[in-house]
Amino acid sequence: MADFLGMMKQAAQLQSKMKAMQEELEHIEVEGISGGGLVSVRMTAKMEVKTIKIDPSLINADEAGVLEDLLVTALADAHRKAESAMQEKMQALTGGLSLPPGLGL
């Protein structure tokens, strides 16, 4: 019985730590860049896009396809960096224990 109560206490502590970490992730921002800086995307580590910046040279009808490709690339780069930031925080929380794939914050 004492083991069960100890586990419940640990679970409550972990839940509290995860909530605090989620709040931290809202304040961590990463930047994805493509086209050598022609397009950049900033997002939080919780995958919320904050800004998209586009070099004015890309804003014309002839460059629409290029701009679309660069946006996709910049978003993917920012997403990858946000995932990495989230994983670093998770490892700090779990003491390096591996969590099952897809178990994020």
Curated annotation (Swiss-Prot):
GO terms for molecular function: DNA binding. Keywords: Cytoplasm, DNA-binding. InterPro entries: YbaB-like_sf, YbaB/EbfC. The keyword GTP-binding does not apply. Signal peptide: none annotated. Pfam families: YbaB_DNA_bd (PF02575). It is found in: Cytoplasm, Nucleoid. One of its GO terms (cellular component) is cytosol. Gene3D superfamilies: Nucleoid-associated protein YbaB-like domain. The keyword Cytoplasm applies. Belongs to the YbaB/EbfC family. Binds to DNA and alters its conformation. May be involved in regulation of gene expression, nucleoid organization and DNA protection. Homodimer. This is Nucleoid-associated protein RPC_4847. It comes from Rhodopseudomonas palustris (strain BisB18). The lineage of its organism: Bacteria, Pseudomonadati, Pseudomonadota, Alphaproteobacteria, Hyphomicrobiales.
